[in-house]
């Protein structure tokens, strides 16, 4: 959950950069600037659960039930939602459709993002098959690997290409984001290439901390380190 909150905060900040200069966009930008990264992460979780409620035909919910879905208290839910200008009605709660639309507007869910994935190993395969990206407005423009045996194969609807094609695809598809699922010894070189090709943000799953130019949007996700932190929390709860 902690990494997902960091990721959502990073995405929201990039969405703010994409905001238009009309008055409505300015209001949303002001609200985004006031939200903490943990609050943004929780809003994204509420958004996910609200869409599940909509799919199930539910029309209303309340802070107690919504909090139980994402493991936070009703008071935290009410505080988060009041911070984006959404106030529930006592005894009635929140209209699911209206609340989902409100949170989506704040998170910038209407912005469409294109990403490329480099490294189609076990983790890369799982990421390519994950359908949750599309719900939040992300599409995978291409996937790359250095193994010729994988070239031309389709994984989750995306065709795997040679890493030699990277610059060509970056120039034509113009994706904004890159997901790195490569070995640590390859990560720095790949990061340099994608940034030179116009990528604005990197989600790095390689077990190394990348050094990138100032102002570059990057999140380093080390799954082993996350497990260490989880073990620490269990030992010290």
Curated annotation (Swiss-Prot):
Taxonomic superkingdom: Bacteria
Protein's UniProt keywords contain Electron transport: no
Transmembrane segments: none
Compartments where found: Cytoplasm
Gene3D superfamilies assigned: NAD(P)-binding Rossmann-like Domain, Winged helix-like DNA-binding domain superfamily/Winged helix DNA-binding domain
GO MF entries: DNA binding; DNA-binding transcription factor activity
Binding site for NAD(+): 119-124
GO biological process per UniProt: negative regulation of DNA-templated transcription; response to redox state
DNA-binding region residue numbers: 45-84
Complex and partners: Homodimer.
Homology family: Belongs to the transcriptional regulatory Rex family.
UniProt function note: Modulates transcription in response to changes in cellular NADH/NAD(+) redox state.
Protein name: Redox-sensing transcriptional repressor Rex
Gene encoding the protein: rex
